[in-house]
């Protein structure tokens, strides 16, 4: 019985020796985009709270009100007796905002991708093994979903639709189901995909298009409902989350009525999971209610991100192709990236170093993210501090 434990310890030791050791740090969220981390108050430039909704009074009030009305837990999966009345209300809001036929609320983003994707790729249902064309930098949960299905991925270069089309052409004669999988905003790079271009390829080659809008929901697209909302009815399935721009927790998919019915009967993560608690649903509902009223907030955050990027680029830093509140500062070397993160911490700023295996070798970076909870002065402070800290590291 000791052998597995020895193997686990050896794994941890190898990660630590490689400088890739991860550990938890207790935090306490504070108002105005601040956080107490290891007892130190920092301006938080590492969260996904893009719209500042995680501390919004309406979300907190509705979460408490729905907890009072329906209790602290759903008590069962939705298929058993946990399909509480609020689910239909939230799904109706999603349908209206996304311009789709149907919606289905799920428990979390990782769970959604890792259970919905295998359901879609089921070889027994499709009558054979499908072809999956996946952006190389898709989220780990999407790659995991394909692996669970036991299907081989054809990975195209990140954001390169010409490369994707060459792959689609090469396999055009194969009489099997074809799937294109992509995020719309990439979580570690902050860049956007050409949704219209993906739709054109989907239509040209008869493929099923699956888009992950986790980091676009709340921030981009019509009324903040994501980039795919500008193309109603043209994407087969859109996945998104409530845990980032919407300030809460949970996930959703939008699709056709027929596909929703299929997932209810086939997606294991939906079938076998206890439904989300009423308090979480209350925060979801409030966020969706607020979204159409938040155009000025979205514009401010995007404009602030553009100013910070411009300042960093003017200082000679590489921020990739970011066009969202996610701003990577590409460093490359892991130890220098960690040193930059520590330098910012000494100045009262939280910017987390992102290293392999989260990102490819040689692309370690600081992943910065802006929030509507920040002031313009916070953003100016960040734009000045990053180049200064990096100069000190470089000597």
Curated annotation (Swiss-Prot):
What reaction gets catalysed by this protein?
6-carboxyhexanoyl-[ACP] + L-alanine + H(+) = (8S)-8-amino-7-oxononanoate + holo-[ACP] + CO2
Keywords (A to Z) from UniProt? Biotin biosynthesis, Pyridoxal phosphate, Transferase
- Per the record, residues carrying N6-(pyridoxal phosphate)lysine are 244
EC class name? transferase
Gene Ontology BP terms: biotin biosynthetic process
Record InterPro entries: Aminotrans_II_pyridoxalP_BS, Aminotransferase_I/II_large, AON_synthase_class-II, AONS_Archaea/Proteobacteria, PyrdxlP-dep_Trfase, PyrdxlP-dep_Trfase_major, PyrdxlP-dep_Trfase_small
Under Gene Ontology molecular function, one entry of this record is: 8-amino-7-oxononanoate synthase activity
Quote the pathway field: Cofactor biosynthesis; biotin biosynthesis
The entry marks the following residues as binding pyridoxal 5'-phosphate, namely 109-110, 187, 212-215, 241-244
Q: What is its EC number?
A: 2.3.1.47
Indicate which residues the UniProt annotation says bind substrate.
22, 139, 358
Please name the PROSITE patterns in this protein's record.
AA_TRANSFER_CLASS_2
Give the top-rank taxon of the lineage listed in the UniProt record for this protein: Bacteria
Cofactor(s) recorded for this entry are: pyridoxal 5'-phosphate
Short name of any one Pfam family annotated for the protein: Aminotran_1_2
SUPFAM superfamilies, alphabetically? Answer: PLP-dependent transferases (SSF53383)
Subunit details: Homodimer.
What does the record give as the function of this protein? Catalyzes the decarboxylative condensation of pimeloyl-[acyl-carrier protein] and L-alanine to produce 8-amino-7-oxononanoate (AON), [acyl-carrier protein], and carbon dioxide.
Similarity comment text for this entry: Belongs to the class-II pyridoxal-phosphate-dependent aminotransferase family. BioF subfamily.
Q: What is this protein called?
A: Putative 8-amino-7-oxononanoate synthase
Question: Which gene name does the record give?
Answer: bioF
């Amino acid at each position: 019985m000791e052998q597995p434990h020895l193997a686990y310890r050896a794994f941890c030791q190898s990660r630590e020796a490689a400088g890739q050791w991860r550990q938890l740090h207790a935090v306490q969220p504070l108002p105005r985009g601040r956080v107490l981390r290891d007892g130190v108050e920092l301006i938080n430039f590492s969260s996904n709270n893009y719209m500042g909704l995680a501390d919004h009074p309406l979300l907190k009030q509705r979460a408490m009100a729905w907890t009072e009305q329906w209790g602290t837990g759903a008590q069962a999966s939705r298929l058993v007796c946990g399909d509480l009345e609020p689910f239909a209300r939230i799904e109706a809001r999603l349908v209206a905002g996304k311009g789709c036929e149907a919606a289905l609320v799920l428990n979390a983003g990782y769970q959604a991708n890792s259970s919905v994707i295998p359901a879609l790729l089921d070889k027994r249902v499709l009558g054979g093994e499908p072809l999956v064309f996946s952006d190389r930098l898709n989220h780990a949960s999407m790659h995991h979903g394909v692996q669970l299905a036991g299907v081989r991925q054809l990975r195209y270069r990140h954001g390169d639709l010409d490369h994707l089309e060459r792959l689609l052409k090469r396999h055009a004669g194969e009489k099997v189901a074809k799937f294109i999988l992509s995020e719309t905003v990439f979580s570690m790079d902050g860049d956007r995909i050409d949704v219209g271009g993906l739709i054109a390829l989907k239509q040209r080659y008869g493929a099923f298009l699956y888009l992950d809008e986790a980091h676009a929901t709340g921030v981009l697209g019509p009324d903040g409902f994501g980039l795919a909302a500008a193309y109603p009815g043209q994407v087969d399935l859109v996945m998104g989350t409530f845990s980032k721009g919407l300030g809460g927790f949970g996930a959703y998919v939008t699709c056709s009525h027929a596909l929703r019915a299929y997932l209810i009967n086939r997606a294991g993560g939906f079938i076998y999971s206890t439904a989300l608690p009423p308090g979480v649903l209350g925060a979801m509902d409030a966020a969706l209610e607020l979204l159409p009223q938040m155009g000025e907030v979205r514009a401010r955050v995007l404009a602030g991100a553009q100013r910070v990027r411009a300042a960093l680029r003017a200082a000679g830093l590489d921020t990739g192709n970011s066009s969202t509140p996610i701003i990577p500062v590409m460093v490359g070397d892991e130890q220098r990236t960690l040193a930059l993160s520590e330098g910012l911490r000494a100045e009262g700023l939280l910017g987390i170093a992102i290293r392999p295996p989260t990102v490819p070798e040689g692309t370690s970076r600081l992943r910065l993210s802006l929030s509507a909870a920040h002031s313009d002065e916070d953003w100016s402070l960040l734009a000045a501090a990053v180049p200064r800290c990096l100069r000190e590291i470089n000597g």
